[in-house]
C-alpha cells in the first residue's frame, strides 16, 4: 500500500455527506472510526449478523460522533431482537429465534465496541452478547458447543468448530 492508502480508515474526506468510497460505505465522513465500525456492522448482514434496514434504522437515530447515542441505539435494536428471539423460541419458531439471537449478538457487540474499558455498561452488554450467542449455538442441529478455557488467569470463550461442522463434512 502506498502511504496515502495506509490510513484510509482515519481519513476525513472532503465530502461531508454519507457516501461510498472505494473501501466501502462512509456513513459519517467526519467521524471515520465510527463510520468504519458501522461498515463492519453492514458487512455482518451478509452472514445473518444483522439486517441492512436495522443497521440503517439504528444509524438514523445516532448523533454523528456521539458514542452515547451509538451505544443507546445499538442496544435498542439488540434488545428488540433478543426479546423477539425469546418469544419466537417459546412459540416453537426455532429458525426465526436463531436469526434473532444471531442479530442481537452482533448488535450487542456493536453497542459495546466504543465503551471505555471501565464503563459499567461494558460487562452487562458483553454478557447479553454472550447469552444470545449461546442461545444461537444451542439451537443449531447438532447444537454448538461452548468451550471455556483458562489462559493467563483470564477466561476466554471459544466455540468448538468441530461441533458446528462435523468432521465428515470437511475432511476428505
Tell where the protein language model's regions lie, with residue ranges.
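N-terminal cap/lid segment of alpha/beta-hydrolase-fold proteins
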Residues: 74, 78-81, 123-167
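Amphipathic alpha-helical repeat scaffolds of TPR domains
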Residues: 36, 72-83, 102-111
Amino acid at each position: 500500500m502506498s502511504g496515502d492508502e495506509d490510513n484510509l480508515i482515519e481519513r476525513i474526506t472532503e465530502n461531508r455527506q454519507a457516501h461510498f468510497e472505494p473501501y466501502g460505505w462512509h456513513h459519517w465522513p467526519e467521524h471515520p472510526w465510527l463510520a468504519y465500525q458501522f461498515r463492519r456492522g453492514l458487512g455482518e448482514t451478509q452472514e445473518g449478523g444483522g439486517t441492512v434496514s436495522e443497521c440503517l434504522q439504528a444509524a438514523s437515530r445516532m448523533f454523528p460522533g456521539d458514542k452515547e447515542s451509538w451505544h443507546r441505539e445499538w442496544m435498542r435494536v439488540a434488545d428488540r431482537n433478543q426479546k423477539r428471539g425469546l418469544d419466537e423460541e417459546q412459540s416453537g419458531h426455532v429458525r426465526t429465534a436463531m436469526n434473532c439471537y444471531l442479530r442481537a449478538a452482533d448488535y450487542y457487540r456493536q453497542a459495546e465496541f466504543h465503551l471505555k474499558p471501565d464503563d459499567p455498561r461494558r460487562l452487562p452488554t458483553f454478557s447479553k452478547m454472550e447469552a444470545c450467542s449461546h442461545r444461537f449455538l444451542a439451537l443449531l442441529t447438532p447444537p454448538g458447543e461452548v468451550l471455556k478455557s483458562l489462559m493467563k488467569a483470564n477466561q476466554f470463550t471459544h466455540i468448538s468448530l468441530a461441533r458446528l461442522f462435523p468432521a465428515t463434512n470437511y475432511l476428505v
